[in-house]
A protein has these predicted regions:
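Contiguous, well-ordered beta-strand patches that form the walls/edges
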Residues: 36, 57-124
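Short, solvent-exposed loop/hinge segments that bridge or flank secondary-structure elements
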Residues: 24-25, 30-63, 111-125, 180, ...
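Structured catalytic/translocation cores of nucleotide/phosphate-coupled proteins
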Residues: 45, 53-56, 74-78, 123-136, ...
Length: 189
């Protein structure tokens, strides 16, 4: 009986957390050499923030040009044996996502961030207001194999950014970063 009650409470909390998720968008300026080289003017991250505070990234947007990478959950095992924990110089506790190469400009991001790779994973430090961000890029490496013959991903770059600010999003749904929202300032289209 107690298990059923606790299960119900957990389910209710999950429903409340999901219902309260808020879509937000933060912009960041590049500070590391890799970030400056790969992003130019920086990045803007569209993410969902739950009640527990940390954000789950949905899209990475180039701040200076209309290019976006849609993200999906990344799997540690796709990086090779041990995942992030087995790589040197990597934050093993970071959130891992894979760039969807078939959506938007995903292929462009794969080629730019990890030349020669066909897949791109991005790990994110905690996304929070007024907090700097670290993104590490990983690509599949056709020439690298683990001792047991499995494929192994490689670290392509460590991108450090300083927090710039938050975009005010229009109400009623997620924003379209490629849409000129200033068109609506002079009345309906």
């Amino acid at each position: 009986m107690k298990q059923a009650i606790w299960g119900g409470v957990a389910l209710a909390l999950l429903a409340v957390t999901t219902a309260r998720a808020e879509t937000r968008m933060f912009s960041y300026d590049p500070i590391s050499p890799d970030a400056k080289r790969l992003t130019g003017a920086g990045v803007t991250i569209l993410f969902n923030q739950g009640l527990l505070g940390s954000g789950r990234p949905v899209k990475v947007l180039a701040t200076g040009v209309p290019a976006e990478a849609r993200l999906r959950d990344g799997r540690q095992k796709d990086l090779g044996p041990g995942g992030l924990a087995a790589m040197d110089g990597v934050d093993a506790d970071a959130m891992l996502f894979e760039v969807d190469a078939k959506a938007a400009q995903g292929k462009v991001y794969v080629r730019a961030f990890c030349p020669g790779s066909t897949r791109l994973w991005l790990s994110f430090s905690t996304i929070a207001i007024r907090r700097d961000l670290r993104i590490q890029a990983f690509g599949d490496d056709p020439n690298a194999e683990a001792p047991n013959g499995e494929k192994k991903a490689r670290l392509c770059g460590t991108l450090d950014f300083s927090y710039r600010g938050e975009w005010r999003l229009p109400g009623g749904g997620p924003p379209d970063p490629n849409e000129d929202w200033t068109d609506t300032l002079n009345g309906p289209r």
